[in-house]
Amino acid sequence: VFATYVHDFDPVIFEIAWGIALRWYGLAYLAGFLGGYVLLKRLAERKLWVLEPAKTADFIAAAALLGVFIGGRLGYVFFYQIPRDGLDSVLHNPLGIFKVWQGGMASHGGILGLMIFTFFYAKKHKVSWTGLGDGLCVVAPLGLMCGRLANFINGELYGRIAHGLPWAVKFPSAFGDSKAPESGQLHSAFQAALEADPGMLNSDRIDDKFQILTEANRESDAVNQAIEPFLEPRHPSQLYEGLLEGGVLLAILWIVRIKFPKAPNGLLTGLFFGLYATFRIFCEQFREPDVAWVIDGVLTKGQFLSIFMYVFAAAFLGHAYKTYKRSKASAA
């Protein structure tokens, strides 16, 4: 019996051929986009969004490519990869920027990308930018939730060490993180796994050991039981973020949109920025920082970036308030 659940999800659902595989990560994004399309079309049909229902599919497709993928990937590269691995990691492998199927997407980058995309889309199609953004912000948490579930399945972006937490999870992927205490236990864990499953491949190379061990962990209960003592129990922070930044935020914004159909443009966008920043800052205290702290032991990179979202929240809420006051004055 394990003291704590040892993460053993396989990020690959099944392999097709020639190294091409269907991954949970890609499926999560697809589910988010399809779900967003369904919800946005419903809002459009109820006249609660500035676009016509027939334009919803094209808008979602363009937003996915130009906003989420490009913005999210560039955000990861500039906010996380370069500060962690240095500029040379990009200069020596520039094509790696486009390998989104390997993971590495920043939600702050995706949000910024969507802001830029919707601004130019609104100008081209002569619709309200804030009205366009309001609809997108209502459904965006669904995509965020799907992304966090994929992070959990991949065993990435795991939480901080949490001894005594009943629902803690042990992540074998921590063996490959040089900053994690588990990395110093890789050799011992590998030897224990070999004894538990002699049929497992052997290797003297550190990189090979990590890959072999994590693959065996997904297939062998004996290996899981053998490596469990060498892993630290951690917060499943991906699930916390999925619940708050995804499920709770989606419910709040959807209720506001339905209950207040004549809410001024910008209100929902402002609420999204403010609530997302609050939930993200809260959840970051349970998440293992991806890169160096902005302020040691006090402020993570995710929290630092989220602080700026309050500025956007204030701007959009201020715009909504002014719009509301003008409409009241003109109706008087």
Q: Where would I find each of the regions flagged by the language model?
A:
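Hydrophobic, membrane-interfacing alpha helices
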Residues: 1-332
